[in-house]
């Protein structure tokens, strides 16, 4: 997966209710293992920059991060690598859009997905701390779910996007003490595919395929109509 986050930092602070005014460079092609912005709950919402690709505390080394960029929402509460983070360290990841690739004629063709009216996206995430011999890594995974009807023709999975009304419920630290079954019952209703009718999609050029490209050209439509 890849995504973009180019909205000005001060706007992110306003939308997510952060006391701190963020200063950020626009990113148009955020890729796994790179640093990403997360929003956590710590006596109020706080920004936290972490590596995208979760490293469990028990991992011998951080090399597994590239395989841990996504956590399936259906099993996140039980998987050993994710369950502690799901219980105690949930976060939001702001984005303007995400990309998915469709296999077609031996090629991978990139598509861009947004919320309607360019509203901000908040991915549901979990985060962890890994430490060995003074080397500390904060890292995260983005939850995924079955794709909605808009994304499904391109890819069978999609990031778990939370509506603004559910941000507090996802971050709520008061649910951290709940038994696994109770927590899953509390958060389970949030773990549904975001409504297709509140999203738009268009194909972008293969320029975005290279992680070395990180500029507005990543969002340029390919030679086809939006729908």
What feature does the model see in each segment?
Residues 1-227:
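Short linear sequence motif anchored by a di-proline
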């Amino acid at each position: 997966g890849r995504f973009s986050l180019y909205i000005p930092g001060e706007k992110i602070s306003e939308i997510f209710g952060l006391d701190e005014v963020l200063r950020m460079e626009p990113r148009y092609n955020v890729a796994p293992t790179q640093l990403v912005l997360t929003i956590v709950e710590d006596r109020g919402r706080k920004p936290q920059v972490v590596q995208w690709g979760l490293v469990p505390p028990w991992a011998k080394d951080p090399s597994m991060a590239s395989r841990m960029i996504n956590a399936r929402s259906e099993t996140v509460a039980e998987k050993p690598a994710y369950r502690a983070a799901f219980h105690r360290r949930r976060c939001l990841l702001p984005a303007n859009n995400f990309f998915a690739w469709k296999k077609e004629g031996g090629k991978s063709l990139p598509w861009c997905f947004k919320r309607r009216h360019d509203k901000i996206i908040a991915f549901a995430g979990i985060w962890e701390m890994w430490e060995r011999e003074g080397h500390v890594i904060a890292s995260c995974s983005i939850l995924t779910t079955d794709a909605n009807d808009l994304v499904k023709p391109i890819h069978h999975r999609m990031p778990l996007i939370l509506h603004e009304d559910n941000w507090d419920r996802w971050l709520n630290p008061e649910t951290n003490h709940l038994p696994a079954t109770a927590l899953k019952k509390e958060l389970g209703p949030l773990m549904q595919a975001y409504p297709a009718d509140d999203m738009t999609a268009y194909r972008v050029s293969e320029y975005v395929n290279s992680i070395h490209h990180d500029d507005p050209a990543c969002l340029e439509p390919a030679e086809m109509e939006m729908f």
